[in-house]
Amino acid sequence: MFGFVINKLKNRKWLNLCLLMGVALFIALFVCHPMFEKGAGNQILDRLFTDHATQQNEYPAQMSREGTYAVADYPDSQSVLDKLSGYEKKWTEYVDINKVSSQQLITLSGGRADTEFGGLNHYFTIGYLPGLSEYADVVKSQTDTATFECSISEKTMDHYGLVAGEKIYLHVPDGSGKKEISFVISQICREKDINDPYWAKTLSDMGDVIFVSQDVFDEMMQYYSEDNISYSDFLMLDYRQINTENASLYDGYMEQFKDADKLYND
């Protein structure tokens, strides 16, 4: 009789232990379920970003603005670049994600041009791209000091049959007719890595731009005092920092940017 009671107590102890373990596992399942759900959501977000990059051939997390400023209001290139950087700063005050890269391009309308080796009546835009030397490979040529140096893309070179060292004679308005300015092609350039996030807009996308230094660009602005400066600004963000906890918040901020600024895009 005594042994029977002892066995019942032992069995009850193991039964209680099993029940306790079951309850603990049950509680753990409910506690961990949101974690599993969150992890799955983050994986889905990451896959969506990756698929977008592959299918659309563009960096998946970017904020951008394109438009024009009057030369009369912005007398030099740095004032325009500072304005664009101000937009980037404002965006990231709300969308608190690390910057991966930023591409800023400013251009003047340029004009018709002839080229040294027989090209007639081509149209070129004058541009300044601050990141060109860092993100593009170049083929250099010898130049003289009597002309302004410029760089062109391989696409522009092929399109017009230009070569390094060739001169471009650009006709620009000076208020009393036409004035000719000579540029010499000092560099042919192409993207070092076209898949780098910096190349939100590739050299081919930029059209027939003759790229000049910042100093030369500022000098050209004197001939376009009644014109506008066109600009594009692309800010690339680290999409890996976007997750299920902040995606809705950041999306809301971006929608507010669109409502407040018709030139903004993402």
Name each model feature, range by range:
Residues 2-266:
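Membrane transport/envelope proteins' first extracytoplasmic loop
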